[in-house]
Structure formats: C-alpha cells, structure tokens
Amino acid sequence: MNPFSLAKKIFDAKTGKDPIDQDVDHGLPFKAKVGSLITLNVSPFLRAEGTLVKAPDRMQTVVAISRLRMPMDGKLYRLYLTKGDDASEMESFIQVYMTAKGDIDELQYYQRMLRMYPETEVDYNLFTGRSEEGLGFKEFSLWKEQMAGIGYDEVLLDEAFGDEEQLVFERQIPGADFLRPFTATENRIDNSAGSEGLLQEVIFMPYVRELESGGQELLLLSAETVKEQNHRQKQEVHVDFMIGVPLTESDVSIQ
C-alpha cells in the first residue's frame, strides 16, 4: 500500500457526482458496525519512532462510521474510535479507502492534535485554498513552540523535534507550488438506527514526512463546516490538525 496513491486517486478522479447511498452503514470495510470491537496491531506505532502520534489503546470500540463523498472511483470511509465533537475531546479514526470492487486498498490511523476556530476571513482562507497559500501549498510546517503552547505532550515533542524548531511535511501530491485542496461531504452515523450523526463539508489536503526510523508520519489538515448534527441544523466552522501513520489490512481486526 502506497500512502501517496489515495491522494493521487482523488486528484486524478473524473468530475461528476458520487452516487448517494440510502445508508452509509452498508458494505462497510471489515463489515464494521457502530459498536464493533476493534483491535489494533501496535507494531506500526512502535515502528514510527519520532512521531507525534500518541500510541492508541490496542482494543477500542467503533463509536461512529462516516463516508466522505467526492468524485472518485472507490469509496472513502472513516471508522471513528472517538468522535471529538467537543474541542476538548480526543478525535481519532481509521480512514479506509475501498476500490470500486469493494477491496480494501489503503488504511491510515489519525488522531487530532489541534482544533482551531478561525476568527477572521483571512484565517479561514488559509485553510480553504482561496488565498492560494496555506492549505494546498507544497509544504506545511509544524513549529515546536506552537505545539508546546497548546500543551502537547512534551516527551513526544522532544522525540519528534529533537534540536529542530520545525517539522516540514510535504504535500502527498507533487507538482505546482499550490494545488487547490480537495472538497468532500462527510456523512457520519453515530448509532445503528441512523438517528444520531453529523453532516459536514470538508476541505482537506494530506501531507507526509519521512521519519528517521524509516516509517512515515501523515498530516491531514481539514477545514470543516458542520451543517447538521442529529438531524438538526448547525453552523460551525473549525480547522482540524490530524496526525497519523499508515496501516495495513492485517493491522486491524474487527468483531
């Protein structure tokens, strides 16, 4: 599995509408359901020495499932281990790309480092691609001082940054200095009846950096506009900084 290939599939996708399923909880990877028990192999997290990712619990429960709808041949799902609807709550999920034939092609584990609420239109435009800088630029840096300022784990910061003041991530899609970020609609269900959930528009771009240990660390930046929660209209705009590592199909077991 090449962590670059999903981004390339999205970038190369033909324009057009993604067919809308009546139920997101259908034909899911690993036959997962809300409430399923998930077991994670710890090896990918141990191999990712120097990462900012906090090693997750080995056994967890799928608390929500979403699908991101956008022009692409396959389907992109997220199996949420924690929803993180509140900024103070951890958000984590396993992102799964399935081919048009229904085969699992790529998996990544992500957890949220930071959620910020843009206060001005200028701030917001940096994470939507409208200003043609910020999100979509070929490189994105995380600064140690900023991460320490939000109270991020000091041990992880020291291991990841070492003597450096910044970590530089490269956009997963090569090419021009700036590429317009991807846009999707995320439909999340929080229970088997579908009576609880979330609907939001997502503008995102994936980045990556090579670790000295030989692994890779993934950075997913997303500007999200919440439209509905539990079938009630809601308007909230925030930007999520998600850090992650690639997984293989054998790293995930669901019952």
Describe the role of every protein-language-model region.
Residues 1-58, 65-255:
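Mixed-charge, low-complexity intrinsically disordered regions
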